Amino acid sequence: MLTSPTLKSLWFLFTILGLLGQNLPCVLSSSHRILVDTDVDTDDLFAILYLLKLNKSEFDLVGITLSANAWTNAGHAVNQVYDLLHMMDRDDIPVGVGGEGGISDDGTIHSDVGGYFPIIEQGMTTTGECRYRQAIPKGLGGLLDIDSNYGFRKQFLPQGNRRYTPLQQPTAQKVIVDKISEGPTTVILLGSHTNFALFLMSNPHLKHNIQHIYIMGGGVRSQNPTGCCPANSTVAECQPRQCGNRGNLFTDYTSNPYSEFNIFADPFAAYQVFHSGVPVTLVPLDATNTIPINQKFFETFENNYQRTYEAQYVFLSLKIARDTWFDDEFYKSYFMWDSFTAGVAVSIMRNSANKNNKNGENDFAEMEYMNITVVTSNKPYGRSDGSNPFFDNRRTPKFNLALGGVHSGHVQTGLRDPTCLPKSGIGRGKCKDGYTQEISGSDSVRVLVATRAKPNINIKSKLDREFYVDFLEVLNRPEETGRFNFSSQFPYYKEELFRPDLSKTRPGKPVVFDMDMSAGDFLSLFYLLKVPVDKIDLKAIIVSPTGWANAATIDVVYDLLHMMGRDDIPVGLGDMLALNQSDPIFPPVGGCKYVKAIPRGCGGFLDSDTLYGLARDLPRSPRRYTAENSVTHGAPRDTDRPELRQPLAIEVWQNLTKSGNGVSKITVLTNGPLTNLAKIISSDKKSSSLIKEVYIVGGHINREKSDKGNIFTIPSNAYAEFNMFLDPLAAKTVLESALNITLVPLATQHKLSSFQTMLDRLYSSTKTPEARFVKRLLVRLQALHQKHRRYTHIDMFLGEVLGAVLLGGDDASLKPKMRAEHIKVIAEGDESRDGKILIDKLRGKQIKILERVDLISISESFASRLDDKKQSAVIGSFEEQKKIWSTPPS
């Protein structure tokens, strides 16, 4: 029998339950765990910030993984996300990127595949083709601007302690597996689907923990509103471009008018995700095309909604995107792609407690169920034409795909694929790779699709979409807000440029350094800056993004110069693509015929772009790449700070050599591909007469078959060296020109490949900040070289200092031995031969070749220069900067 206290307890419990009433599900339910996979495009940042602003007890962002095969490069992307999370006080969120695993020829998916390539191109390494990614521009409006967020990333975001570190960075697959193993998770895909498709294919036992997948991408019934002609225009006056297309491939709509960038980045991966059996909600172009960043939204944002750091960062990003937009149609062409997707996903999840909400009811988008699929190949199916690695030259299709099935047709091979072009040259392209097509039948999947953005329920508002209001209000909430930006992080922050007073110094030999920003190039730059100015006067640096680092890595050059007190040295940015590799119709894009030889992961771009994880230890320079531009330089309009525009390599050269500058004949030292120098001497015939001599670090001259080159990723090319191979036509242009050339070939570089020899010299004394930094870099390179198979090649970067030391050292101690040879360079479009240097005594161009040098003297000269307190660092590190900015001035 129940006692009186028991009855009272029950009565109290029932009373509380009655008071809670309809809110009971919210009390008892746990938060929605969210995992985001992103390509870190600018609009992805908006979506991530929107999610971070939500109440963590309701929506918990538990992990972020990065798509490394689309709109960003892994090294720049991961550090930007770390900084964004640091601003928002969310250093607890794991970030995954890359991985060194592969897919074997039999279809076995090994652990930690990095997602650097679409699944159809993924082999056992991180080198490969750019079948789909070549549709993304490498420079302005493309990877350069996204990697740097138009220059605002370093200006605005605070820098925390988290960073990419070789062999310690969590991989994309590890973060996905860990987070989904922990419990039911909702996944939001904002970029390509490679990472998540690999997870699904490798971990079917974890599928039950995926509650729902929300996808931004594709176009089902969409009609592209951009590139349309005015209603009253004639054919002679206007030719429509993308107008009415399903997709948004603005660089290749003549081949494929159906696909959208996120799905096009890896159609097969998207197919796997859609057909996984997990419930999918798609927010395609159909819906996002109805919610542009229109002028009223922009002005409302600008005038009334910048009360938090995160809102300011979003607005600054939008503003520079608008100010640098290629035409005057920004307000009709830039949409709320990923942020709208995040909003729709959150609203559906919020309403999911209502069991009757089976049709995805939400506050922001109208929804409809459709039967769709993702097109991965083109009809007719089953015909082998060399375009489809899943089937071509195979007895058994990869992944046991069906012969004659939907994956067995022609697969678009790249830009302007002849099979994809209309036969007459007029009309729409024929390829549909990546098309989210509405179909019926067994291959279709029932997907919940957002069809359009809902209007604002407040008809008196200037903002005519409901999500406009929510987005601005969420970003500006005082809760879950950012702590500081880069400048407010430090109470005594001050931007300061360091320029030496050289008025009383008689300058020495004028030198221009052409670098591709490999680790060896930064070692060389330190050395050049330490040579007395009365011996070497470093006039300019020009960087080549056709080599071992991506264009946004130019910021590391600026930081190093700032450290050494040389903010007076101009830095020019070279062409994004090797000679003759640009697309003739849309030059900002092009293939990767040669640069594909560089790994995208460990020991390649990932490490070069971060200087093996040490770039963030350099002091932060006020100078950096920015997308600021001006009409004077061909931009459609002036931005707010056109004086901050990043100069091009050719412009830096022209400013240096124009009459009145008083510069005598210039010595050029090249440490990378010869793209910049080839363009300089080809664009202006007078340039050659202004060059006294050229020292070229690179090239390989083999006298015996056993004497191999160093293109370790292209087995068919046994005799070329990277700097020549990465732009063979440029190498041919320069080496066969009338220039006075000294070549520092691979064989000579190889003689200086011992990290220990160099470290022994540096260990004895490291009095200067630059010597200490170089020692740390060399110690890290040595450790990686010894520990991991992906780093066995990096000792080749040590030999790159030979050119700088030869130029700035003492011949009496270095004892260089030269020989003359007549050579020619192969540049025929054959990757098995291009970049090879041949001896041709009859028709070859005569150059000098460094055959031998005293290696002990090289090491001693390098170490002693770095340890010399003259021309030493003005500020030693970012840590030193932080202390200065945190201490009141005396």
UniProtKB/Swiss-Prot annotation:
It comes from the Eukaryota. Induction: By jasmonic acid (JA) and wounding. Its EC number is 3.2.2.7, 3.2.2.2, 3.2.2.1. It is found in: Secreted, Extracellular space, Apoplast. SUPFAM superfamilies: Nucleoside hydrolase (SSF53590). Optimum pH is 4.8. It catalyses: a purine D-ribonucleoside + H2O = a purine nucleobase + D-ribose; inosine + H2O = hypoxanthine + D-ribose; adenosine + H2O = D-ribose + adenine. Pfam families: IU_nuc_hydro (PF01156). GO terms for molecular function: adenosine nucleosidase activity; inosine nucleosidase activity. Glycans are attached at N55, N232, N371, N485, N580, N655, N740. Its main location: secreted. One of its GO terms (biological process) is adenosine catabolic process. Keywords: Apoplast, Glycoprotein, Hydrolase, Secreted, Signal. Belongs to the IUNH family. Extracellular purine-specific hydrolase present in the apoplastic fluid involved in the degradation of extracellular nucleosides, including inosine and adenosine, and which may participate in wound and pathogen responses (e.g. Botrytis cinerea). This is Nucleoside hydrolase 3. It comes from Arabidopsis thaliana. The lineage of its organism: Eukaryota, Viridiplantae, Streptophyta, Embryophyta, Tracheophyta.
